[in-house]
UniProtKB/Swiss-Prot annotation:
Biological processes per GO annotation: one-carbon metabolic process; S-adenosylmethionine biosynthetic process
Tagged with keyword Protein biosynthesis: no
Name assigned to this protein: Probable S-adenosylmethionine synthase
Essential cofactor(s): Mn(2+); Mg(2+); Co(2+); K(+)
Cofactor note: Binds 2 divalent ions per subunit. The metal ions interact primarily with the substrate. Can utilize magnesium, manganese or cobalt (in vitro). Binds 1 potassium ion per subunit. The potassium ion interacts primarily with the substrate.
Any one GO molecular-function label of the UniProt entry: methionine adenosyltransferase activity
Location of this chain's protein in the cell: Cytoplasm
Amino acid sequence: RPEEIGAGDQGHMFG
């Protein structure tokens, strides 16, 4: 999911 692409970096859409 696009919002989990940067899960290790706060997330792409998590902040």
